[in-house]
C-alpha cells in the first residue's frame, strides 16, 4: 500500500509569503522618508509612477543599474548588513551624476535562499539612507525568495535608478580639451570594487588589525561615498566638461570613457594621500602598483574635468560642500584613442 501524500504549501517549498508581507510593512516608512513630490502613489502597486519635474524644459532621462559585487560576501560573513544598501544606491546614482543627471527614483532587487526579515529590513533601510543622501525616491523593488538558488540566508542585490537632465546640459565628454584641469574627489574606501581581490588577500593575511585607529574591517565595509548633491551644485556654478566615476578598472579604465579622441589624461599619483587601507592591500597582496590603480580607486572616487580658469572656484565649492577635493592632473593633446598616464608610480 502506497503512503498517502500530504498536501503541500508554498511554505513547504521554502517560500514564506507572510514573511514577505511583513517585510513590506517594515520598509514602507523607509520609502516614505525618501518621497519626492513627483512620485504618484505608494508601495504595493504593480508599477510605480513618477512625473518629470516641471523645472526641466527639455528633459532627457538617464538610467543605470548596478550591484555591490562580492563586498556582499564580506558583509554577510561579518553580519554587517546595515550599509550595503548605501553601497547599492551609490553605485547607481554616481553613474548617473557623471552625465549631469539628477537622480529621480530608485528600485531594488533583493534575492535570497531564505528570507530573513530582520536582515532584509536592515538592507533596505540602508537603501533608503542612500536614496536620502542622493535626493531620489525609493519607489519600489522586488524581494525574491528562491530556495535552491542561494545558500540559506545568503542574498544578492541589484539596483536600478532613473535620473533627468536638460538636453543641453548632458555631460558626455565632448567639451573636454587640452588644458583642462582634473580634480579628484576623495573616496571613503574601496567603495564597491575589487572585493574579490580583497577577500583573496584577507585569506592569506592577519586581518584583526587597526589602520589609522580603526579596525581593518571598518575600512573595508565603509559605504561608498555618494557625490550627487555636491556635484549638482558644482554643475550649476562651474562649467564642468566631464566627470568619471572611478569604479572597477580604476583610473586607467574609467577616465578614457569620458575623453574624446586625441586627448590624454595625465595624473600625478603623488598629488593625493594613498590611503592606509590601500597601502595594506598592496603590501599584504604584493600587488604591483599599476595593478592597484587598475583594480581599485586608490583614494579617488570621482574625477572632474574643468577649464583651468575655473579650477580654484570648483575646488572651493567642493570643499565647502564637504568633499575632499584636490588637483590631480590635466588633459593634454594625445594621438588617437584617449589614454591615461599615471605619473609617479613605483614598481
UniProtKB/Swiss-Prot annotation:
GO terms for cellular component: cytosol. It is found in: Cytoplasm. It catalyses: 2-formamido-N(1)-(5-O-phospho-beta-D-ribosyl)acetamidine + ATP = 5-amino-1-(5-phospho-beta-D-ribosyl)imidazole + ADP + phosphate + H(+). One of its GO terms (biological process) is 'de novo' IMP biosynthetic process. The keyword Cytoplasm applies. Its EC number is 6.3.3.1. CDD domains: PurM (cd02196). Keywords: ATP-binding, Cytoplasm, Ligase, Nucleotide-binding, Purine biosynthesis. Belongs to the AIR synthase family. This is Phosphoribosylformylglycinamidine cyclo-ligase. It comes from Alcanivorax borkumensis (strain ATCC 700651 / DSM 11573 / NCIMB 13689 / SK2). The gene is purM.
Amino acid at each position: 500500500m502506497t503512503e498517502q501524500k500530504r498536501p503541500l504549501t508554498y511554505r513547504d517549498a521554502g517560500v514564506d509569503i507572510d514573511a514577505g508581507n511583513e517585510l513590506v510593512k517594515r520598509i514602507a516608512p523607509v520609502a516614505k522618508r525618501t518621497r519626492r513630490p513627483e512620485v504618484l502613489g505608494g508601495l504595493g502597486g504593480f508599477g510605480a509612477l513618477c512625473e518629470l519635474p516641471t523645472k526641466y524644459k527639455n528633459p532627457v532621462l538617464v538610467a543605470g543599474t548596478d550591484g555591490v559585487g562580492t563586498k556582499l560576501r564580506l558583509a554577510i560573513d561579518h553580519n554587517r548588513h546595515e550599509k550595503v544598501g548605501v553601497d547599492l544606491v551609490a553605485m547607481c546614482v554616481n553613474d548617473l551624476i557623471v552625465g549631469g543627471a539628477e537622480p529621480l527614483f530608485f528600485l531594488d532587487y533583493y534575492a535570497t535562499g531564505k528570507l530573513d526579515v530582520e536582515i532584509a529590513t536592515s538592507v533596505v533601510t540602508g537603501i533608503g539612507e542612500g536614496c536620502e543622501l542622493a535626493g531620489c525616491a525609493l519607489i519600489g523593488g522586488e524581494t525574491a525568495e528562491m530556495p535552491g538558488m542561494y545558500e540559506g540566508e545568503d542574498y544578492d542585490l541589484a539596483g536600478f535608478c532613473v535620473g533627468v537632465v536638460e538636453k543641453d546640459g548632458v555631460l558626455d565628454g565632448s567639451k573636454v580639451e587640452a588644458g583642462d584641469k582634473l580634480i579628484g574627489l576623495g573616496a571613503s574606501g574601496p567603495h564597491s570594487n575589487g572585493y574579490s581581490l580583497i577577500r583573496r588577500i584577507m585569506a592569506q593575511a592577519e586581518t584583526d588589525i587597526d589602520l589609522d585607529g580603526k579596525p581593518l574591517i571598518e575600512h573595508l565595509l565603509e559605504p561608498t561615498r555618494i557625490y550627487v548633491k555636491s556635484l549638482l551644485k558644482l554643475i550649476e556654478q562651474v562649467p564642468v566638461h566631464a566627470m568619471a566615476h572611478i569604479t572597477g578598472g580604476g583610473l586607467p579604465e574609467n577616465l578614457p570613457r569620458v575623453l574624446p579622441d586625441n586627448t590624454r589624461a595625465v595624473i600625478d599619483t603623488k598629488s593625493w594621500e594613498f590611503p592606509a587601507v590601500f597601502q595594506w592591500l598592496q603590501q599584504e597582496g604584493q600587488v604591483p602598483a599599476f595593478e592597484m590603480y587598475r583594480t581599485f580607486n586608490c583614494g579617488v572616487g570621482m574625477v572632474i574635468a574643468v577649464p583651468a580658469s575655473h579650477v580654484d572656484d570648483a575646488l572651493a565649492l567642493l570643499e565647502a560642500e564637504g568633499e575632499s577635493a584636490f588637483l590631480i592632473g590635466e588633459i593634454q593633446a594625445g594621438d588617437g584613442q584617449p589614454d591615461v598616464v599615471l605619473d609617479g608610480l613605483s614598481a
